[in-house]
Amino acid sequence: MSERNLNIEKERYIFRKAKAEDLPAIAEIYSKIHEEEKKGSLYVGWLPGVYPTADTAETALKRQDLFACEEEGNVLASAIINQCQVDVYEEGDWTYCGSEEEVMVLHTLAVNPNATRRGLGSAFVKFYEEYAIQKGCSVLRMDTNERNTIARKLYRKLGYLEAGIVPCEFNGIPEVNLVLLEKKL
């Protein structure tokens, strides 16, 4: 699946694998999220210069698991979608079990703060679910910071169950209470 067109709220979004030319826009999205968090208008729990960074996106691009959402040629959101479960997932109280081949994971979903309240987060998660189905995966997993109440509310609304909260250092960020989430397709 290289490209998927979805019409959401009369807006045309294109979900696709990211390209090298998308990296500056994705890094800018990360920077804008960090800026909004510094202002106190958003809480995701990420740290500038630590996670996520331009290197986060570049590494995912090299692995070919970085995805972008664009509208009229502008990248509005990105995410990493793969079958890599991070170490702390071992501590999850998972309801849905599956072999590594049956589990798809969503990481680092980032929506440009200037494009919020347009359904992009929901649309990206729906794209992730469709992508998982096409890849033969029936178990979905993801995580978020306990304090990221906006994401937690969205994921609950989309049918995801919380499978535990694990205190850890996550991607170089100390003292994170990581919420593990899951859904069965």
Label the predicted regions.
Residues 65-79:
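Conserved beta-hairpin
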Residues 54-68, 84-88, 105:
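A short helix-loop-beta-strand connector motif used in the catalytic cores of GNAT acetyltransferases and
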Residues 80-108, 115-116, 169-173:
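Conserved acyl-donor/pantetheine-binding loop and adjacent beta-alpha core of acyl/acetyltransferases
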Residues 1-24:
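Conserved N-terminal entry element of GNAT/NAT acetyltransferase domains
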Residues 125, 132-143:
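Conserved GNAT acetyl-CoA-binding A-motif
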Residues 27, 34-56:
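Conserved GNAT-fold acetyl-CoA-binding loop/helix
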